[in-house]
Amino acid sequence: MTRFLFAIILGFLLTACQQVTVEETEYVPHKLTELRVGTLYGPQIYMTSGQGNSGFDYDMAVLFAEYLDVPLKMVPYTNRAELYEALKKNEIDIIAAGMTETPARREQFRLGPPLYRVNQVLVYREGMPTPKDITDLKGKITVIADSSFVETLTQLQKRHPTLVWDQVTDKDSEELLAMIANKEIDYTIADSSSVQINRRYLPDLRSGLVLEEKLDVVWLLPPTHSDGLMSQLLAFWHQEKLAGTLDHLNEKYFGHVKRFDYIDTRAFLRAIETVLPRYRQLFETHAGDLDWRKLAATSYQESHWNPNARSPTGVRGMMMLTQPTAKEIGITNRLDAEESIRGGAAYLRDMINRLPESIPESQRMWFALASYNIGYAHVEDARKLAESMELNPNAWRDLKKVLPLLQKRKYYQKTRYGYARGSEAVHYVDSIRRYYDTLVWVDNQSKQQNSDEEEPSDLASEDGPAPVPGTLSPDKPK
C-alpha cells in the first residue's frame, strides 16, 4: 500500500515539475557514470576554500550523487548564459545555482522540486532615501543579464513604461552587492537570502521594496531526454524531505543570518582590522583541531577580544571563564590573554567530546557552544525535552526551538536541572555563527589578495573559470 501511494505521489510530482512546452523525443535510457552539476559561485550556492567546499546547492548535490552512487563533478560557470548553453549541449546534467522558478525557465527547461523560497528585493545602500515605489528611485538599477530579475523588471515595465535598467554580463550578484556598498552603482535586485548573507560583510546594504514574494528555488534539467534523471531527483527529494535534510540545510545556511545588527557588524569588522592581529597567532596556536576562526568568534562574543573584560557574575578574560572552570582546566590567570584562550579552547573541546556520538559532526560545535554558554546539563535537558515533543534531539534546528522553553515553568519544572536562559543560548550561538562566517570571508579575501599579489601573471582570462567571491564543573556554564 505504501509503495502504491508513493508511486502516485511520484507521478504527480513528476507531472507538476515538468511544465515544459518542448515535446519529448524518443527517450534513450542513459546510465550516469558521474553527476555533472553546472553551478555559479556564491556563499549560498557553491564556495571553495581551504576549509573545503560549501553551499546549499553543493551540499544537496553531494547527497544526490551519493544517492545515484556516482562521483560528483561540480562545473562552475561565469554567467547564466553559459550555464544554459552547457545544459543544452549536454556538457552538464543539471543546473544547481540558486535559481528561482520563472515563466521563461519553465519554457526552456524542466524544473526540479522546490528547495527553499526567497523574495526578490530592491537593494540600495545605507544613507540613501528609502524608495516607496519602483518609480521613486534616485538613480539607476543594475542587474545581471539572463537573471530572473530581468524578467521581473520586464513585467514591471509594462505598468511603468519609463522604467529602465542596465544589464551586465561580466559581474555576478555578489559583485553587484559590493558595488552598492562601495557607491559604484545605485540600485540592484537580489534574492532576500543573498542580501541576508552578504550584509554580514557589507553592513551598508539595505533591502527595500519586495518585488516578488515566495519564489521557489529549483534545479534545472534538460527539456528532453531527462525522464530518468527527473524521476531519480524526485525520489531523492522525497527521501531527503522526509529525513529533514532540507530543513537542516535551510537552518545551516539561512537560520542564523536573519537577525542583523548594523552597529555591531560595523564594530566587528573594525575589530578584525585593528584588534584581531594582536591575538590571531594565539587563536591559531591553541585552537588545535578546532577551526581557529570559530574560537576567535567565540572570544569576540564573550569579551570583544578584551583580555581585561569582567562581568558582575565573576567571569573574566578573553574567553570569560568562571573561577571554578579556570581551576579545573589549569588556568591560573584569567586576565592573561594566552592563558584565557588556551583555557577556553580546552573547555570548548571538552564540551564537544562530551556530546553524544549521535549528534552529527557538522552540528556538534553549535551544541558545544550552547553548553559553553548555559552548561552541558541544561543542553541535555533540552535534548530530552525535544525528544518528548517528537523533535530530533540531535538536530540544532530543533534544539534551538526547544531551548527557550527552559525559561517557562510549564517546561523547566519537568527537567532535571530546572530553569535556564535558553533563548540567550540560541542568540549566543547564532551570533558566533555570524561572526565566524564574517571571519571566514575576511580571511579568504586576504588570502586571495595575497595570492594575486604574489602571482599576477596567473590571473584567469576572461574566458577562464569564474573567480571565487570572498576568496568567501562541566555541568555549569563557564
Swiss-Prot record:
Keyword Cell wall biogenesis/degradation: yes
Main subcellular location: membrane
Entry-linked InterPro entries: Lysozyme-like_dom_sf, MltF, Solute-binding_3/MltF_N, Transglycosylase_SLT_dom_1
Catalysed reaction, written as an equation: Exolytic cleavage of the (1->4)-beta-glycosidic linkage between N-acetylmuramic acid (MurNAc) and N-acetylglucosamine (GlcNAc) residues in peptidoglycan, from either the reducing or the non-reducing ends of the peptidoglycan chains, with concomitant formation of a 1,6-anhydrobond in the MurNAc residue
Transmembrane domains' residue ranges: none
Gene Ontology cellular component terms for the protein in this record: cell outer membrane
Active site: 302
Main EC class the enzyme belongs to: lyase
Subcellular location field: Cell outer membrane
Region (Disordered): 446-478
SUPFAM superfamilies per UniProt: Lysozyme-like, Periplasmic binding protein-like II
Keywords: Cell outer membrane, Cell wall biogenesis/degradation, Lyase, Membrane, Signal
Membrane topology category: Peripheral membrane protein
Domain of life: Bacteria
Acidic residues composition bias: residue spans: 451-461
GO molecular function: peptidoglycan lytic transglycosylase activity
EC number(s) given by UniProt: 4.2.2.n1
Pfam families xref list: SBP_bac_3 (PF00497), SLT (PF01464)
Region (LT domain) residue spans: 258-478
Purpose of the protein: Murein-degrading enzyme that degrades murein glycan strands and insoluble, high-molecular weight murein sacculi, with the concomitant formation of a 1,6-anhydromuramoyl product. Lytic transglycosylases (LTs) play an integral role in the metabolism of the peptidoglycan (PG) sacculus. Their lytic action creates space within the PG sacculus to allow for its expansion as well as for the insertion of various structures such as secretion systems and flagella.
Domain notes: The N-terminal domain does not have lytic activity and probably modulates enzymatic activity. The C-terminal domain is the catalytic active domain.
HAMAP family: MltF
Family stated for the protein in its record: In the N-terminal section; belongs to the bacterial solute-binding protein 3 family.
Protein name: Membrane-bound lytic murein transglycosylase F
Lineage of the species this protein comes from: Bacteria, Pseudomonadati, Pseudomonadota, Gammaproteobacteria, Alteromonadales
Gene that specifies this protein: mltF
